């Protein structure tokens, strides 16, 4: 077409019948991502009002550092746990095309911001972790039954009860005779007694209870794969603050460690982990 530059609207468009509709919040992020893929861009610059992703929530940690480089996989882990700068749907179009995203600040245009790169990128920061994120508002269904590990289909039956009631589970730590299911409080609202009754009928546990007021805190970073003792440092940071860990989960990718703690300990736990991995290395 001979055009060097094209300006397109990012937050509204036309429906199939020609009506103009505005997109939901973050819609322009998605538009930019789709256009970047369509023109096979070398990079997608997303200009916003922050200088990239921060290692921790600035409402909890004072003046947290900016993440210089983050992979798509790390970003998804942090976004799932509540870290938000870029609309989640804006990631997929450029991720599949291998196009990096640069988050930049319109109010501070000289700041390099954060580069979001492919998952096989070997570039790492000077820190073991990439980011810390978490959410409150979870509960745990704790079950105990003798010889649980020998009972065929126990887990399937419990999860079937949750599915029948439209309840999604987040994590499921277990032992030989114990099992806990971490669930969003919002999903359980108005369903708790019905779910417990159906679980009792399905698997007849020796003991079952619901523990409320749980927060989940995720420590994410590809640097953890090549660093020994990361989990030990997380636990030590919390132990020194006398914070009790209710649940531990680590994926096989070694990309993240998730701990369950009391909601009242959420802010302090975040600060202690940040101090352990960021402030202590400076």
Sequence positions of predicted segments:
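C-terminal catalytic "cap/lid" subdomain
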Residues: 1-282
């Amino acid at each position: 077409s001979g055009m060097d530059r094209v300006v397109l609207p990012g937050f509204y468009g036309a429906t199939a019948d020609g009506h103009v509709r505005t997109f939901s919040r973050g819609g322009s992020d998605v538009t930019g991502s789709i256009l970047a893929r369509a023109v096979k861009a070398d990079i997608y610059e997303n200009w916003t009002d922050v200088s990239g992703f921060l290692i921790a929530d600035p409402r909890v940690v004072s003046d947290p550092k900016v993440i210089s480089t983050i992979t798509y996989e790390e970003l998804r882990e942090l976004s799932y746990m509540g870290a938000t700068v870029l609309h989640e749907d804006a990631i997929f179009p450029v991720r599949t095309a291998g196009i990096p995203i640069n988050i930049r600040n319109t109010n501070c245009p000289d700041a390099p911001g954060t580069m979001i790169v492919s998952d096989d990128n070997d570039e790492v920061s000077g820190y073991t972790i990439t980011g810390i994120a978490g959410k409150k508002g979870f509960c745990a269904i704790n079950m105990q039954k003798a010889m649980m590990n020998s009972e065929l289909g126990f887990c399937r039956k419990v999860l079937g009860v949750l599915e029948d009631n439209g309840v999604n589970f987040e994590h499921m730590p277990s032992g030989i005779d114990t099992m806990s299911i971490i669930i969003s409080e919002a999903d359980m609202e108005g369903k708790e007694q019905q779910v417990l009754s159906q679980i009792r009928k399905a698997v007849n546990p020796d003991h079952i209870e619901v523990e409320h007021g749980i927060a989940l805190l995720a420590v994410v970073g590809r640097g953890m794969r090549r660093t020994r003792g990361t989990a030990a440092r997380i636990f030590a940071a919390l132990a020194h603050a006398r914070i009790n860990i209710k649940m531990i989960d680590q994926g096989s990718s070694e990309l993240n460690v998730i701990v369950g703690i009391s909601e009242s300990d959420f802010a302090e736990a975040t600060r202690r982990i940040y101090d352990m991995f960021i402030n202590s290395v400076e």
